[in-house]
UniProtKB/Swiss-Prot annotation:
Keyword Plastid applies: no
Organism listed in the record: Symbiobacterium thermophilum (strain DSM 24528 / JCM 14929 / IAM 14863 / T)
One Gene Ontology cellular component: ribonucleoprotein complex
Highest taxon above the source species: Bacteria
Listed name of the protein: Large ribosomal subunit protein uL23
Subunit structure: Part of the 50S ribosomal subunit. Contacts protein L29, and trigger factor when it is bound to the ribosome.
Pfam family, any one: Ribosomal_L23
Amino acid sequence: MEARDIILKPLITEKSVAKMSEGKYAFKVRLDANKTQIKQAIEEIFGVTVVRVNTMRVRGKLRRQGKYIGRRSDWKKAIVQLKEGDSIKVFEGL
């Protein structure tokens, strides 16, 4: 699996933007990705040093379309803490 296949997209929320000052960044990742794969992918894509990776599985919400009830897909969130002094340039200015 390539690094760009593991990291699906960055998560930009009010809470994640507040955590960026602490060097913590949030990403949506593949459900089957483990912490080691996530760490290697972030280091390869952004050229930074990862200190810690926390992951959580997020259950999909129930959604209704008229009389039909469906469910969004489950997904995985990764909170990545970088070495002090490192930052990801894409997120700066948020």
